[in-house]
Regions:
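Dinucleotide-binding Rossmann-like beta1-alpha1 core, especially the glycine-rich loop
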Residues: 82-103
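FAD/FMN-dependent oxidoreductases across multiple families
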Residues: 234-314, 318-320, 327
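Glycine-rich FAD pyrophosphate-binding loop
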Residues: 26-47
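C-terminal helical "tail/cap" subdomain of flavin- and related membrane-associated enzymes
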Residues: 316-409
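Beta1/beta-strand and adjacent pyrophosphate-binding region of the FAD-binding site
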Residues: 4-17
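N-terminal Rossmann-fold NAD(P) dinucleotide-binding loop
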Residues: 20-21
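Predominantly flavin-linked oxidoreductase catalytic cores and closely associated redox partners
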Residues: 109-254
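N-terminal FAD cofactor-binding segment of flavoenzymes
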Residues: 40-77
Length: 409
């Protein structure tokens, strides 16, 4: 029988990704007794996210320069085929974060504001006992830690370690949509790096990555991120991601002798309409655990941070009101609707567009349609492209085009 020890706190946050790390630091700042745990023993490891963000997010979410890998001011879209289009701005448009540094910084902030951080702890299960949550965590040596808390937050990402997957959808198209990604961190020559610096480059079209896309993002001088991502299509046999990324490297970096510093990857799993329960009693979901990853660009960091900005004040109110006669469910009843409002009305539109675009992108006909859409962007400014890809402002390109884009025509 593994030995067991126990801890008490007001809020236990399971998962030190962008969502959990941000919530823990916000709550600690407000004087809440918070414990942040993660199964990783080192937050530098498994830095699976390519972590591209628009520049405004740095200020909106109060992120420091130390978490930035590089800045970019240009979009470059390669494909379908060999067509290359680029849009440049004189100003920085965004950043590529060092994902490990972001997680470390958040955990460090939580500690500095008086919170507790415990790594190498895997949450196994949780249940409610009266008005407290009891969560069992396993250490690498098999011993157990029992944490009793007023609230437990499942910020374990797409794994949804405590909340579990949403109940089977009434309509099959409302279920979880999955995307799989693989990324290599490459050491390249400075001459090679300079060709890709300052820009986000995406490869689009079925001859690059069927049902998905590839990318090269710059990090600090001499380091690039090379990645592939695609929607999982159970109806189709899909080529292995390892083969696709090797081929991408061969085509984009011809003749370059690069060193692979790290290989990482992961899954993104989200529902399109985000109607799943966000809470079960005193267990609350945050970030990817409640489908805040957007499937159009596999982008979830901003939205994970948004979910914690919404939840933090509501949790504080709920803690302040503890003892009053409101139930846990009532105390956080505004969470899901407020988060839906914060993500905006274009959210599920972008998800449907993602499903249609990526799943359909496996043949020349779809490449032709994509090429037409990209041609329509030729006269845009780089800032307009950011508004489209980060702000999901499809209506700018004509409401008449939307039914076509969404597959209603
Ligand atoms: C290949 C790839 C590329 C991406 N690129 C981008 C990008 O460019 N821009 C962008 O915005 N987003 C990107 N994303 C998505 C983004 O990384 C996620 O949406 C974001 O990290 C979600 O944050 P989170 O905190 O909700 O979950 P996560 O970041 O997944 O964090 C969850 C944490 O919980 C821990 N955990 C899981 N289970 C347990 C358990 N049982 N016990 C304890 N701890 C546990 C994990 O170790 C992890 O640290 C990418 C994703 C992938 C896979």
């Amino acid at each position: 029988m593994p030995s067991e020890s126990s801890l008490h706190c007001q809020v236990l946050v399971v998962g030190a990704g962008p969502a959990g790390g941000d919530l823990a630091r916000r709550l600690a700042f407000q004087g809440v007794d918070v414990i942040l745990v993660d199964r990783l023993t080192d937050l530098n490891r498994s830095a699976f996210s390519s972590a591209a963000l628009p520049i405004a997010s740095m200020q909106v979410f109060g992120l420091p320069a130390e978490v930035v890998g590089s800045r970019w001011r240009q979009w470059q879209l390669i494909g379908p085929g060999s067509a290359t289009r680029s849009w440049a701005s004189p100003q920085p448009l965004g950043v590529v974060l060092d994902f490990g540094a972001l997680r470390r910084w958040q955990a460090d902030q939580c500690l500095r504001w008086g919170g507790r951080v415990a790594l190498g702890l895997q949450a196994c299960c949780s249940h409610q006992e009266g008005e407290r949550m009891v969560t069992l965590l396993r250490r690498a040596d098999g011993t157990l830690l029992r944490v009793s808390s007023d609230w437990t937050v499942d910020a374990s990402g797409q794994a949804r370690a405590l909340l579990g997957d949403p109940p089977p959808a009434q309509r099959p198209r409302d279920g979880l949509v999955r995307a799989a990604g693989l990324e290599w961190l490459l050491q390249v020559s400075l001459t090679c790096w300079e060709r890709w610096a300052d820009r986000l480059s995406f490869c689009l079209g079925s001859d690059w990555v069927p049902q998905g896309y590839g990318w090269i993002f710059p990090m600090q001088p001499g380091v690039l991120k090379l990645g592939v991502c695609r929607l999982v299509d159970p109806q189709r046999q899909q080529p292995p991601l390892g083969r696709l990324i090797t081929e991408l490297g061969r085509r984009l970096l011809p003749g370059e002798v690069f060193k692979v510093l790290d290989r990482h990857g992961g899954l993104v799993r989200s529902t399109i309409r985000r109607r799943e329960p966000h809470q079960r009693g005193r267990l609350v979901g945050l970030g990817d655990a409640v489908s805040t990853a957007n499937l159009l660009g596999g982008e979830g960091i901003r939205h994970a941070l948004t979910s914690s900005a919404v939840l933090a004040p509501l949790l504080q109110e709920a803690l302040a009101a503890s003892g009053a006669s409101t139930s846990a469910q009532q105390a956080l009843q505004d969470y899901a609707p407020q988060l839906r409002r914060a993500l905006g009305w274009r959210w599920s539109l972008s998800g449907r567009l993602a499903r249609r675009t990526w799943l359909g992108l496996h043949e020349a006909k779809a490449d032709g349609r994509l090429d037409q859409v990209l041609r329509g962007l030729d006269g845009c400014r780089a800032e307009d492209l950011s508004a489209l890809l980060f702000g999901y402002r499809f209506e700018r390109y004509g409401l008449r085009a939307m039914p076509y884009l969404l597959g209603w025509r």
